[in-house]
Amino acid sequence: TPWKHSQSSVKKWGGEPKDYIALHDWFDETKAFTGDWTHRALRHHSAGIQWAIEKFGHTIKNSKGHDIPTKMLAEQHVEEDCGFIPTPADYLKQIKNNAQKWMLTVGKKTITTKLEIA
């Protein structure tokens, strides 16, 4: 949970859990889409770590006044959940190896409703 990740961050870098909760909430908010561990495919990878830096800046200042590198905090989160830092390709490879028919359909026409303005 984000709280447990925040407590882990405190053990590594000091401060209070509230210093880190926004970052860890951000990684895990994708649970709203899937409700299970598969949410990790959306942010728990090397690109997600870069996105975290873009969102939170290069450092997060903790309550002790220390600037903690966002990259290290994000890597901590991903490593705690995945055991290593996967790339997006690591997740996509699994999809490619088990592609569903709807994923392979090319050129299928979609129906678009015509907008009429009175």
Map each language-model feature to its residues.
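N-terminal membrane-targeting hydrophobic helices
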Residues: 1-118
